[in-house]
From Swiss-Prot:
Belongs to the UPF0389 family. This is UPF0389 protein GA21628. The lineage of its organism: Eukaryota, Metazoa, Ecdysozoa, Arthropoda, Hexapoda. It is found in: Membrane. The keyword Transmembrane helix applies. It comes from Drosophila pseudoobscura pseudoobscura. It comes from the Eukaryota. Its main location: membrane. PANTHER family: GROWTH AND TRANSFORMATION-DEPENDENT PROTEIN (PTHR13674), UPF0389 PROTEIN CG9231 (PTHR13674:SF5). Disulfide bonds: none annotated.
Amino acid sequence: MFNKSALIGSLLRRSFGTTNPLRQAIKNHQPNEMEKRFLVWSGKYKSQAEVPAFVSQDEMERVRNKMRIRLANIMIALTVIGCGIMVYSGKQAAKRGESVSKMNLEWHKQFNELKPEGGAAAPASTK
């Protein structure tokens, strides 16, 4: 059923081929300008001039993940702020006596007044 030598061979290849120190030692990724900014913003380097020409793929993955998380947190904060602004705006409109149903009734009233008197008009919907 099981081929022990194939199983052991695959486990050895998997453990030796992707060891963490070996993957970190291989610096084969050349960062572009945006990735250099990411490396600086994440605190890995002090300035873009200090960023080396090649960095490891693992380092770049970690930096991208940090930036993805930061961007998601910023979007969450902006969404919460936007919701708060909309709630405040709605409460102010309610104090002024504005409502969606009143705006809808006014629009229908204006629409019906502007409708031509001829028979070509669309039939009014009944509720």
